[in-house]
């Protein structure tokens, strides 16, 4: 497949990130490597979206702290960014709402094709530049002027870098304004972009708990967007999917990262990290990056069981 015929992917991870761990970052890396090896996808960005403060989970520290820790954790990445939208809303947002927000945002700022996982490329949803009258899809048959793959990828990369890769100094605590004027964007037929939910097998298993998830939301998340699962603790994802009629229905939309490498970070969790911090366990350096540890100690977070 050529670069332009491959599906371009943005991986979106929702969660508490209380705190964000090395395991979370490795989850992104493993998912990207796996998707690239399939030969069908190009991962062009990763988004960390911390949950709103009103989520109500015991021990959840304020979103301001969690956003800063996430920013510190990804500061050396050239493709993963932290998005504050979910935290800045008036109340808690469903995972489905967060996915839809980012899909709509990508339509506005990239102008490229955004497809649902089940939508064939001949019937795409076309992104429109904000505050601009819709124009016909590019149909110029003049080879000399028609966008090349390099031009297409360059334009998409330019737009995404403005919203996905802006890394302001943490102390200023200013994030990119999603409504900022990004200028006129070109529109293309050649690029197909999807936003996939990135999660661990624990979230996948939560889909099987009766009443925990809204079934209509599950249909959209799995049926329209699709999921990339990075298993934890050697979880049996096939068994998990067989316990949910919706997961069985859309099993082809669920990509499970499978590799032969033993990943020690797959057993790292935020809970384990908090316990290590509370008990002064030196193994915390195996769970969290040093900038995150330094911030936690400076802010005196997680020093007791209540967070």
Curated annotation (Swiss-Prot):
Task: Give the matching CDD domains.
Answer: NMNAT_Eukarya
**How is the cofactor bound here?**
Divalent metal cations. Mg(2+) confers the highest activity.
Q: How does it assemble?
A: Monomer.
Role played: Nicotinamide/nicotinate-nucleotide adenylyltransferase that acts as an axon maintenance factor. Axon survival factor required for the maintenance of healthy axons: acts by delaying Wallerian axon degeneration, an evolutionarily conserved process that drives the loss of damaged axons. Catalyzes the formation of NAD(+) from nicotinamide mononucleotide (NMN) and ATP. Can also use the deamidated form; nicotinic acid mononucleotide (NaMN) as substrate but with a lower efficiency. Cannot use triazofurin monophosphate (TrMP) as substrate. Also catalyzes the reverse reaction, i.e.
Lineage of the organism: Eukaryota, Metazoa, Chordata, Craniata, Vertebrata
| Protein name per UniProt | Nicotinamide/nicotinic acid mononucleotide adenylyltransferase 2
Q: How does its activity hinge on pH? A: Optimum pH is 6.0-9.0.
Provide the lipid-modification sites (S-palmitoyl cysteine): 164-165
**Transmembrane region(s):** none
**Entry's family note:** Belongs to the eukaryotic NMN adenylyltransferase family.
Q: What class of enzyme is it?
A: transferase
Localization (cell) = Golgi apparatus membrane; Cytoplasmic vesicle membrane; Cytoplasm; Cell projection, Axon
Regulation of protein activity: Inhibited by P1-(adenosine-5')-P3-(nicotinamide-riboside-5')-triphosphate (Np3AD) and P1-(adenosine-5')-P4-(nicotinamide-riboside-5')-tetraphosphate (Np4AD).
